[in-house]
Amino acid sequence: PAHMDRTQRMYERAKNHPGIVIWSLGNEAGNGINFERTYDWMKSVETTRPIQYERAEQNYNTDIYCRMYRSVEELLVYARQTEPKVYRPFIMTEYLHAMGNSGGGLKEYMDVFETEPIVQGGCIWDWVDQSFREIDADGRWYWTYGGDYGPKNVPSFGNFCCNGLVNAVREPHPHLLEVKKAYQYIKATLVDKSNLTLNIKNWYDFTNLNAYILHWQVVGDHGKVIADGTRRVDAAPHATVEVMLGAVRLPSDVREAYLNLSWTPVDAAPFINTDYEVAYDQFVLSGNKNYRTPETKLS
């Protein structure tokens, strides 16, 4: 009865809220007849929104296969399974645990999300550190957590609650920039280094890329800008277009160079100014065949 009461109260409380797009039966509580019955009840009253439960795995009482912290290899095995053929989308309820120096494997996950339609993403655990700012005896502030409160030797998971992309006052941790890069909606591939030809993919669902300005630079290994420019790109949502920037001759004192791309909005929008970078890429260009080692002058 307790499981059913909680599920029914949740549904009645939130059924008309526009922010509810998926229902969850619970978190990390095993599976069994209680969750089968609550799933059955939810399906009897809910006709449009999916219902998921992570611990159901591939049993019948979940509309989404949503196991947490699966490897890239497991995602691919699921996506390519044919006997029996899978039909439920794979959306990890948690992945990429954002504690400490984390986020380094995100690109490999994004490659799967963008190439396997049935593997549809996941939820990073989590957004913000659960900690407090305190002042020590010397007047210096520090973050507190877990066993910093309560009697000595109180049971605690230590700093395990400090696993966010931002700290407790919403200042970004370094790995938030990794997430921004991986999640950017404009992605370029350099297909011809000689003529600086790019394939540009627009991952936006509703926005044409002409809402943004492409800023490009060719920068030498000495840090100087060799060539630069801006470009407006017309690409419908989910389209891929080819853009040629043109050949750039490298000076003889440049051994190698890099192509930097940066995208900014044409018009300001809430929270985003026209100088805000929404996406970027960098490519190493071919080595300079005309490079000459600078002469060393002895004084």
Region annotations inferred by a language model:
Residues P1-N199, W203-N210, H215-V225:
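Extended substrate-binding grooves/exosites of carbohydrate-active enzymes
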Residues I213-A257, W263-T264, F271:
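Intrinsically disordered, low-complexity Pro/Gly/Ser/Thr-rich segments with frequent PxxP/GP/PP motifs
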Residues V218, I226, K289-S299:
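Flexible inter-domain linker/hinge segments
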Residues V248-P294:
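Terminal connector regions
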